[in-house]
Amino acid sequence: MVLPALPAPPVCDSQNECVGWLGVAYSAVVDVIRAAAHEGVYIEPEARGRLDALREWIYYNYYTERAKRRDRRRRSVCHARTWFCFRKYDYVRRSIWHDTTTNTISVVSAHSVQ
């Protein structure tokens, strides 16, 4: 697996903790993409599309919720968006892998994903 396993977001409706989790997830995705480019690892187009889509989802939610952090009425919305991003992150993390023999990052076939 390419992306690191992150702990689940906080169970409570704490906006600061949810925004913090989104920030960690965003930096993890960006670091994986940057490290692959730096080390010359080829990312197949389908895997690249999944990583880019995940990066954009987390980026949008992170900066939206960070900007609206002071509005206490958005607490449940922030919590729901964070859990959505966690499920999306976990799905992408399980669906791509790094083949060290060919030095590529590719998508795992659908029937081998658990």
From Swiss-Prot:
Effect noted on mutating Y42F: Partial loss of phosphorylation ex vivo
Effect listed in the UniProt record for changing R66K = Partial loss of nuclear and nucleolar localization
Keyword Nucleotide-binding appears in the UniProt entry: no
Task: Name one cellular component (GO) term.
Answer: host cell cytoplasm
Q: Spell out the post-translational modification annotation for this entry.
A: May be phosphorylated by host SRC kinase.
Question: What are the annotated disulfide bridges?
Answer: none
Pfam families listed in its UniProt record: Adeno_E4 (PF05385)
Cell location: Host nucleus; Host cytoplasm
Q: Which GO terms describe its biological process?
A: mRNA processing; RNA splicing
What keywords does the record list, in alphabetical order?
Apoptosis, Early protein, Host cytoplasm, Host nucleus, Host-virus interaction, mRNA processing, mRNA splicing
Motif Nuclear localization signal in this chain: 66-75
Q: Does the keyword Ion transport apply?
A: no
Primary role: Plays a role in viral alternative pre-mRNA splicing. Activates dephosphorylation by protein phosphatase 2A of host SR proteins and converts their splicing properties. When expressed alone ex vivo, induces p53/TP53-independent apoptosis called cytoplasmic death. May mimic nutrient/growth signals to activate the host mTOR pathway.
Q: How does it assemble?
A: Interacts with host BAZ1A/ACF1, host PPP2R2A/PP2a-B55alpha subunit, and host PPP2R5E/PP2a-B'B56 subunit. May interact with host SRC.
Q: Which family does it belong to?
A: Belongs to the adenoviridae E4 ORF4 family.
Name this protein carries in UniProt: Early 4 ORF4 protein
What is the species listed in this Swiss-Prot or TrEMBL entry? Human adenovirus C serotype 2 (HAdV-2)
